[in-house]
A protein has these predicted regions:
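Terminal alpha-helical segments
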Residues: 1-105
Length: 105
């Protein structure tokens, strides 16, 4: 297992998820809730891919495989954790925007 390759997979998928979160928030601000939901689902799928790559690495090490320390992998985990929190926050904002839209209608 090339730990740096896995790290890049995590970073790239999480980063793509972050881009979808930004699109979702832009859609929310424009009261395009269907678009926001679509972007959030896309973000969730990409973050899941990143999470799965991370989990496979952790499980391999737990099973006894020698996994060398990698600062890049640590950065990837930090990136994934941060973007996962952003996704959770964006998912919680969608109903708030919907409530605001219904009160202003």
């Amino acid at each position: 297992m090339d730990i740096n390759q896995v790290a890049m997979e995590v970073i790239l998928n999480a980063g793509d998820g972050r881009a979808d979160i930004e699109l979702a928030l832009t859609s929310c601000a424009a009261f395009d809730f269907d678009g926001a939901e679509t972007h959030l689902k896309d973000a969730e799928a990409k973050i899941l891919q990143a999470h799965n790559a991370q989990t496979e690495t952790i499980q391999a090490q737990a099973a006894g495989e020698d996994v060398e320390y990698s600062l890049l992998f640590t950065h990837a985990q930090d990136t994934l954790m941060t973007i996962s929190a952003e996704l959770h926050f964006a998912q919680r904002l969608l109903p708030v925007f919907r409530a605001l839209a219904s009160k202003n209608a």
